[in-house]
Amino acid sequence: MGSAKILSFTLLLFVGYTLVHGSTPKHYIVYMGDRSHPNSESVVRANHEILASVTGSLNDAKAAAIHHYSRSFQGFSAMITPEQAKKLADHNSVVSVFESKMNKLHTTHSWDFLGLDTVYKNNPSALDSASNVIVGVIDSGVWPESESFNDYGLGPVPEKFKGECVTGDNFTLANCNKKIIGARFYSKGLEAEIGPLENIVDSIFFRSPRDSDGHGTHTASTIAGSIVSNVSLFGMAKGTARGGAPSARLSIYKACWFGFCSDADVFAAMDDAIHDGVDILSLSLGPDPPQPLYFENAISVGAFHAFQKGILVSASAGNSVFPRTACNVAPWIFTVAASTVDREFRSDIYLGNSKVLKGLSLNPIKMEGSYGLIYGSAAAAAGDAALNASFCKEHTLDPTLIKGKIVICTVEKFTDNRREKAIIIKQGGGVGMILIDHNARDVGFQFVIPSTMIGQDAVEELQAYMKTEKNPTATIFPTLTLVGTKPAPESAAFSSVGPNIITPDIIKPDITGPGVNILAAWSPVATEATVEQKSVNYNIISGTSMSCPHISAISAIIKSHHPSWSPAAIMSAIMTSATVMDNTHSLIGRDPNGTQATPFDYGSGHVNPVASLNPGLVYDFSSQDVLNFLCSNGASPAQLKNLTGELTQCQKSPTASYNFNYPSIGVSNLNGSLSVYRTVTYYGQEPTEYFASVERPSGVIVRVTPAKLKFWKAGEKITFRIDFTPFKNSNGNFVFGALTWNNGKQRVRSPIGLNVLST
């Protein structure tokens, strides 16, 4: 579903109102803080009365209202003008008013790569204990008939669960079981903004929790899919599919349609999920950059209330590539970047001179014989520039020149639709595509004709062959799945990057996990992105959408082992046990040229589920710590009172954000010497000593006091100081290092990021 279609319906919906009132209404969320109320009818009445104060009448208020939030926090959403929204923001019971923006979805072997078998081998009870953990998934729904959601061997639904199985199109009570224990759907917000879903042409959808997109099915099965053997995509990545926590339960919240998720619908889903009693909440979605302020963003607000209730919220960092584009960056959200695993999908090219070029693709189609090669630039349509044709854009290629040939195209920019190029070639009579993509080390795509992507080394060989051969030919081979490739992991080229645009002292993203070429369950009616648009039950896709459920699953495993741990403790355990080394014992890289990745790419590093179960030391923080953090970022006492339901005063000297007890250490404006403080809690059993070691950021002297921490029993807390003394400016860039505590058994590592403004 294209954004242009959605935009056209939005314009049609509001044009009449604009003519009458002279001001276009927009969809706003009116957030009123932590005042949940069991009597939803009284809340609705109160919301209508508040809304009527700006609309002029109760009837107009009822017509404008879309969602009412009352289960876990209070508020509503409504179609109102910017002027009316401004008036509501001044109401004494309102924390904030912000426009409901559109979020986007951040679109087997990975668990072996992470060593998850070791977790279950060393902890045989893990599968049983995980069955009491409930993971809420806010996404595009679920395909319940997938074998990944069978409930063989699972016990009764946990008594703590208060959710529902909501029926609808092609979805009955029988579609829920002891694996999918709850399912809801939300579309009011999106329909208020774009009109009825039925108006979206050429799109299959179900007005129910059933997934027509595939994305939600994929993420849910990655988290908690049951073990299913002999799974593949057209023979690729063949093996056993499973979720990271295959005994965990799933509660599905469908808030995304056609790849878009209205803030107001996501907020409603979070309101329900918190009330339903989920333990982990997974969101593979987020806003386009720039990231909205914390309390002008539905995900940040909803996640704060989840954090208060002991629910960890794991969310994808986004696929926006560039610096300062990471989303979902509130410190109470676990922000997940994407990285590769040690598996490649090779679709090589056999040239007419018998040389073989390395290509990457998800290409199951066998090409019979060899075909002529032609550059797209040499096949430009009449009146079109060769440059445009080299990118194989629509209407730029001459069908008479490409018919029966393999066309060599070039990626113009990172955001190019690579699949579309193959469609254009097929429509013109071409039989294959070689796509020059200098980032061709990551994502495997599916195409409608035999196609493969090549990087710089292969490009040079191909160009040399094309220059010397009068009638060049080639064959594109079907994909072979190679396991054990090196180096891995690498930061995914598409993964959004820090620094945190709102609070740069808080390093974001937090962690990275497998997000490239991940095989998981799929909706068989979602055929738009598959080879020749064929129906499949399992699919391979990439994105931070795929890495997020890996972290959600590992969080669920830790929660099952340590039910009393706070969300912050679970985050800390995963972050401080992460690795920054690949399988060649080198630092994790970012691109094919060997550029090293930084904490702005991978946060604290690549997740290590085995080590995260026994972290040794934890950087914990509470809801009160978050409130102190908000004070340092300008929150008023009135906002805090509405937020928490209690009178909360900010300290006269609020704690600086670089002293927030986060597992990473960031200072975005280092002017001369500075002391930063952290407190660790001992999560071991026996007396032990930890010793500090520092990887020093360039141009900065670092001293840790005390440099030795002695613990006698579990639960002990010790505060230490890190003194930074810069002797060289960093010229507007961050310099990185790390602090590690080590007791000979556990290493507790925190990345350091400093922007040195003056010495």
UniProtKB/Swiss-Prot annotation:
- Cite the Peptidase S8 domain residue spans from the record: 110-613
GO molecular function terms here? serine-type endopeptidase activity
Q: Which residues form the active site?
A: 139 (charge relay system), 215 (charge relay system), 545 (charge relay system)
The question of whether Protease is a record keyword is answered with yes
EC main class here is hydrolase
Q: Which residues does the UniProt record annotate as the domain PA?
A: 390-462
**A biological-process GO annotation:** response to symbiotic bacterium
Entries under Gene3D superfamilies matching the protein: 2.60.40.2310, 3.50.30.30, Peptidase S8 propeptide/proteinase inhibitor I9 (3.30.70.80), Peptidase S8/S53 domain (3.40.50.200)
Cite the EC number: 3.4.21.-
SUPFAM superfamilies, per database record: Subtilisin-like (SSF52743)
| This protein's UniProt keywords | Apoplast, Glycoprotein, Hydrolase, Protease, Secreted, Serine protease, Signal
Chief place of localization: secreted
The record ties this protein, via InterPro entries, to: PA_domain (IPR003137), Peptidase_S8/S53_dom (IPR000209), Peptidase_S8/S53_dom_sf (IPR036852), Peptidase_S8_Ser-AS (IPR023828), Peptidase_S8_subtilisin-rel (IPR015500), Peptidases_S8_3 (IPR034197), S8pro/Inhibitor_I9 (IPR010259), S8pro/Inhibitor_I9_sf (IPR037045)
Q: Where is the Inhibitor I9 domain?
A: 28-105
Q: Where is the signal peptide?
A: 1-22
A GO cellular component entry from the record:
apoplast
Record localization: Secreted, Extracellular space, Apoplast
Q: Which residues are glycosylated?
A: 170, 230, 388, 593, 642, 671
| PANTHER family listed in its UniProt record | PROPROTEIN CONVERTASE SUBTILISIN/KEXIN (PTHR10795)
Family classification: Belongs to the peptidase S8 family.
Tell me the function of this protein: Required for arbuscular mycorrhiza (AM) development during AM symbiosis with AM fungi (e.g. Glomeromycota intraradices).
Name of this chain's protein: Subtilisin-like serine-protease S
Organism of origin is Lotus japonicus
